[in-house]
Amino acid sequence: MNKDVFEGKWKQMRGQAKDWWGKLTDDDLDRVGGKYDKFVGLLQEKYGYTREHAEAEIDRRVKDVKEAVKKA
């Protein structure tokens, strides 16, 4: 997935990230600041994901956000 797409959709995703990944806090999300690599690392840290698993989860959520925007 393109890092630019993630970073461009961050504002839409940030609000839902805590619903998707309940272990994340506002401080965690502030620390990430919409940076793809930092978010991947955060998911690895909090959930024990491999890099590939974290990227796949993010890709899935970005697609969900893109679809929701298209329908709106």
Task: Give short role names for the model-derived ranges.
Residues 1-72:
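Intrinsically disordered, low-complexity, hydrophilic segments
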